[in-house]
A protein has these predicted regions:
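N-terminal helix initiation/capping motif
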Residues: 1-31, 41, 93-106
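Short, conserved beta-turn/loop elements at beta-strand boundaries and strand-helix junctions
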Residues: 20, 33, 71-76
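Short acidic/polar mixed-charge low-complexity motifs
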Residues: 22-24, 59-60, 75
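Short beta-strand-centered aromatic/proline hotspots
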Residues: 26-27, 63-69
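Short, solvent-exposed secondary-structure boundary/capping segments
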Residues: 37-40, 74-83
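Short conserved beta-strand and strand-loop elements enriched in small hydrophobics
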Residues: 13-18, 47-61
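Extended Gly/Ser/Thr-rich low-complexity repeat segments
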Residues: 48, 54-55, 89-101
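A short beta-strand motif that forms part of the nucleic acid-binding face
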Residues: 30-32, 42-44, 56, 68, ...
Length: 106
């Protein structure tokens, strides 16, 4: 049984991450209104504030700032989005909708 509060959209989606400990290219393994899982060889520290951006239709789109809640070397890390404002939440819903639509037409 899936205990997640928000349904996930499974990737992969090409992206980049940036945080205090570094950054790099990555793949978003899945994304939801609650956060995302980032597949990356390099990982930030648990508790670190991290930004993730992806390209969609030639446009770079920035996900809300999140906090790394788990990290595993060689696999990646989970970012949680918390306390999003109405505008951030609306933008994230729009982005997930666009990714879902792109998946259907691919």
């Amino acid at each position: 049984m899936n205990q997640r509060e928000h349904p996930r959209l499974v990737g992969p989606f090409e992206a980049r991450w940036r945080g205090a400990s570094g950054g790099g290219t990555c793949l978003i393994g899945d994304i939801s209104l609650g956060g995302c899982f980032v597949n990356s060889a390099a990982i930030p520290n648990v508790g670190e504030r991290t930004s993730v951006s992806l390209e969609l239709g030639g446009e770079e789109l920035l996900l809300p700032m999140g906090t790394v809640v788990t990290a595993e070397w060689g696999l990646g890390f989970a970012v949680e989005f918390k306390a999003l404002g109405n505008a951030e939440l609306a933008d994230l819903k729009d982005l997930i909708g666009r990714l879902r639509q792109r998946r259907r037409t691919a």
